[in-house]
A protein has these predicted regions:
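Acidic/histidine-rich, surface-exposed loop or edge segments in extracytoplasmic proteins
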Residues: 166-168, 179-196
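Conserved small/polar residues in nucleotide/adenosyl-binding loops
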Residues: 256-262
């Protein structure tokens, strides 16, 4: 692997943006990965961020054409900080010529919130993994009645969105309430490549936003008695991987397209 990608780690208190300094980050290639196998030790600064480091990645060309080998390398990350629970993140995805950003929401040792796991396993990108195909929906379909008794005059961009980490038929799967802007970036990082041209990334983000706002505006799941807005099953909605790494190129495009035009 002659090509290089980059990684920055960000550590915050729980689901806030309060930085955690002095956090130790231990990074190593995932099992079966080529290249250097040595551990890399990093420490967060007063902003809760590590320095940006270069890591081995497959050739850039792999991400530009279909039917090529997996275009990203995988790394496992362990986060340690006194006063907080350890966090393990397996399968951080590094593309050539791309900056990956790994957010780490650390739980204080005295906090035992059940919805937050200590281990995050990042699933393959949908272009590489084995995911169920989208179940076709009728173009004109009856909409469930609004749960509030009030019909919104136009789509509203929410501050938060609740994601069900499973199919609609899996009531045991956890729900995650995350900032809407972070949800869009997470979905894009799951479904497209960060190395694509800016115009291609933008077109995909438009599609993700449109579909997501439709689910919220129509109260597609809440109108059926569910306690969430959307699922992470590709058979019904978008892929979403709680706690996965994001990308600077995707975040930059998302930032300018997360509100509706006036």
């Amino acid at each position: 692997m002659a090509d290089k990608g980059r990684l920055k780690i960000q550590c915050y208190v729980n689901d806030t943006y309060i930085p955690v300094d002095g956090t130790k980050a231990i990074l190593k290639p995932s099992s079966g990965q080529e290249g250097e196998s040595k551990e890399i030790n990093l420490v967060t600064n007063s902003s809760g961020e590590t320095e940006i480091i270069e890591l081995d990645a497959p050739p850039f060309s792999y991400s530009q054409e279909p039917s090529r080998p997996t275009p990203y390398s995988l790394y496992d990350l362990r986060i340690e900080r006194p006063g907080f629970q350890d966090l393990l993140i397996n399968g951080v995805q590094i593309f050539s010529q791309s900056l990956a950003i790994q957010p780490c929401n650390l739980i204080k040792s005295s906090n035992t919130r059940s919805s937050r796991a200590d281990v995050i396993n990042i699933a393959p990108n949908t272009l590489n993994g084995n995911y169920p195909a989208k179940i076709p929906e009728e173009v004109d379909k009856p909409l469930p009645p609004p749960t509030s008794g009030v019909v919104l005059p136009k789509p509203v961009v929410p501050e938060f969105i609740t994601v069900h980490a499973g199919s609609p038929n899996n009531d045991s799967a956890p729900n995650y309430k995350v900032p809407y802007k972070d949800y869009i970036k997470n979905v894009a990082s799951c479904e497209i490549y960060s190395t694509w041209p800016e115009s291609t990334i933008r077109a995909n983000i438009y599609a993700i936003i449109s579909f997501t706002l439709n689910r919220i505006y129509t109260e597609w799941y809440r109108g059926k008695g569910k306690n969430y807005d959307i699922t992470n099953s590709t058979a019904y909605d978008h892929a979403f991987n709680y706690g996965r790494n994001l990308y600077d190129s995707i975040s930059a495009v998302s930032y300018t397209h997360l509100t509706l035009p006036t």
